[in-house]
């Protein structure tokens, strides 16, 4: 495994985000499998929240699906790196504030969310919505 992914894995265990992700996967009834680059893929998560095809807590990628596409895994891997850079749990309020700001300025939770943009909107399957004040009449 690449050194940067080993660092990310260790950092996310130390900052407790990966243990939190593992706990969420257990509570959510997900089946855990080793993934690429030190990720842990948790399939069959049973809860409807959060509303996303997949979400990442530490190095744990949780999904209700039974498989994930390569691009989505790359996207979620970038979120795992964000957890490490945010030193773990501070990622939660930072992400929520970023999501709220995106909703306010364009009406979509991901389009202007800095975390989703840095993880690549296209790889995550998110649209690129225009800002409210830049929309022409009749566009939505």
Per-range role (PLM):
Residues 1-37, 41-45, 49-52, 87-140:
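Metalloprotease/metallohydrolase-associated module, dominated by Zn2+-dependent proteases
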Residues 48-73:
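Short pre-active-site segment immediately N-terminal to the catalytic Zn-binding motif
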Residues 65, 80-81, 85, 122:
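Generic hydrophobic alpha-helical membrane-span motif
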Residues 71-83:
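Active-site recognition of the HExxH zinc-binding catalytic motif
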């Amino acid at each position: 495994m690449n050194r940067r992914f080993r660092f990310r894995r260790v950092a996310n265990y130390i900052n407790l985000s990966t243990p939190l992700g593992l706990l969420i996967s257990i509570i959510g009834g997900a089946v855990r499998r080793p993934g690429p680059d030190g990720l842990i893929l948790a399939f069959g998560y049973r809860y409807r929240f959060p509303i996303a095809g997949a979400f990442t807590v530490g190095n744990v990628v949780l999904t209700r699906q039974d498989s994930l596409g390569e691009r989505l895994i790359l996207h979620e891997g970038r979120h795992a790196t964000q957890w490490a850079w945010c030193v773990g749990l501070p990622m939660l309020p930072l992400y929520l504030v970023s999501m709220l700001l995106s909703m306010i300025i364009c009406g979509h939770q991901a389009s202007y969310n800095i975390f989703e943009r840095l993880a690549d909107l296209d790889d995550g399957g998110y649209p690129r919505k225009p800002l409210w004040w830049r929309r022409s009449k009749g566009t939505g």
